[in-house]
């Protein structure tokens, strides 16, 4: 049987371009051959200002890019603050929120992913972080809505003595993004 062709988008996390202005970061993203950008909050701040959101979205479109995700966003027990992030993402057309959620945020996040039909992708960090191991992420998402999953930062997993191929295998079905880096 012939292999099924797959299309996936390859983007850059804007944090990698944090020393550049928004316009320069978008231009560099396009010049590097990427078709998507994952914004981080300092480059595309969380706001309910529709004019500001439209301006950024137009700049993204002008470069022929799309937004793959937004993060890494902190989520806590503050349901009002969490809702602001989701409302912003909905207005901006962002379907995945890369996140570092506290344990007490998950009940609210579960409600929000259902209400907004968005995904939350837990981003792991290196040794000592609450999500340094793939099992930490799997425990956090266990018995949660399928829209709560992972964004596997493979560089951080390597620092935490995890094997990237095994991480990807274990997160199958709940892996909504991958960050690649070389420290």
Where are these regions (language model features)?
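Short secondary-structure boundary/capping segments
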Residues: 2, 57-59, 110, 148, ...
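Conserved beta-strand positions
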Residues: 12, 39, 99, 122, ...
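Aromatic-lined glycan-binding groove of carbohydrate-active enzymes
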Residues: 167-183
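Flexible loop residues that form catalytic
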Residues: 42, 75, 102, 180-183
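Active-site acidic/histidine proton-transfer and metal-coordination neighborhood
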Residues: 24, 66-150, 158-161, 170
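Short, glycine/acidic-enriched loop or turn micro-motifs at the edges of active sites
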Residues: 41, 126-127, 156, 182
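N-terminal pre-domain/capping segments
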Residues: 1-96, 114, 129, 173
């Amino acid at each position: 049987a012939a292999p099924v062709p797959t299309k996936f988008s390859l983007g850059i996390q804007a944090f990698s371009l944090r020393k550049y202005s928004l316009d320069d970061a978008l231009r560099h993203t396009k010049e590097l051959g990427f078709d998507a950008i994952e914004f981080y909050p300092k480059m595309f701040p969380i706001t309910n200002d529709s004019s500001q959101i439209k301006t950024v979205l137009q700049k993204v479109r002008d470069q022929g890019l799309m937004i793959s995700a937004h993060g890494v966003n902190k989520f806590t027990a503050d349901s009002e603050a969490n809702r602001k992030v989701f409302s912003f993402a909905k207005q901006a057309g962002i379907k995945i929120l890369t996140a570092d959620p506290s344990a007490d945020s998950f009940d609210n996040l579960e409600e929000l992913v259902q209400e907004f039909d968005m995904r939350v992708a837990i981003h792991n960090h290196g040794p000592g972080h609450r999500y340094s191991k793939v099992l930490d992420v799997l425990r956090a998402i266990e018995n949660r809505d399928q829209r709560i999953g992972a964004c596997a930062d493979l560089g951080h997993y390597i620092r935490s003595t995890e094997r990237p191929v095994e991480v990807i295998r274990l997160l199958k079905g709940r892996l909504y993004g991958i960050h690649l880096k070389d420290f």
